[in-house]
Amino acid sequence: MLQPSRRKYRKEQKGRNTGLASRGTHVSFGEFGLKATGRGRLTARQIEAARRAINRHIKRGGRIWIRIFPDKPISQKPAEVRMGNGKGNPEYWVAEIQPGKVLYEMEGVSEELAREAFRLAAAKLPISTTFVARHIGA
């Protein structure tokens, strides 16, 4: 699964996920893309589950790009531990997603196959998404 190899700090503050995506909003590498229309957090496991769903559907054809990376650690306290006594340990990694961000891209397959593969992938994700195609000349 995806996670950073090393970081300056182990833990990060919660923060707020606001605004629209300003970078990574266009299909840059492939012909078709899966774009987020909602906001939220995608865990490394969810990103991997969606990638597997896409790969299973397109079989050996085509090429896939993952345009997001889980670089934010989420900490949790163990079960049945009293409040206080510091922040919990980092348990998993998430990517903060804003509306407009392209999550996955694909090329080398027909549009129908790409649509179906992205539909299966979107079912694994907790945010709403839409299918987008590259605009030639844009």
Curated annotation (Swiss-Prot):
Q: What ranges does the record give for the region Disordered, renumbered to this chain? A: 1-24
Q: Name one GO cellular component term.
A: cytosolic large ribosomal subunit
Q: Name one GO biological process term.
A: translation
Family annotation (SUPFAM superfamilies):
Ribosomal protein L16p/L10e (SSF54686)
Residue spans of biased composition, Basic residues class: 1-13
**GO MF annotation, one:** structural constituent of ribosome
Hey, which family's this protein in? Belongs to the universal ribosomal protein uL16 family.
Question: Record's NCBIfam families?
Answer: rplP_bact (TIGR01164)
Q: What is this protein called?
A: Large ribosomal subunit protein uL16
The record lists the organism as Bordetella pertussis (strain Tohama I / ATCC BAA-589 / NCTC 13251)
Gene designation: rplP
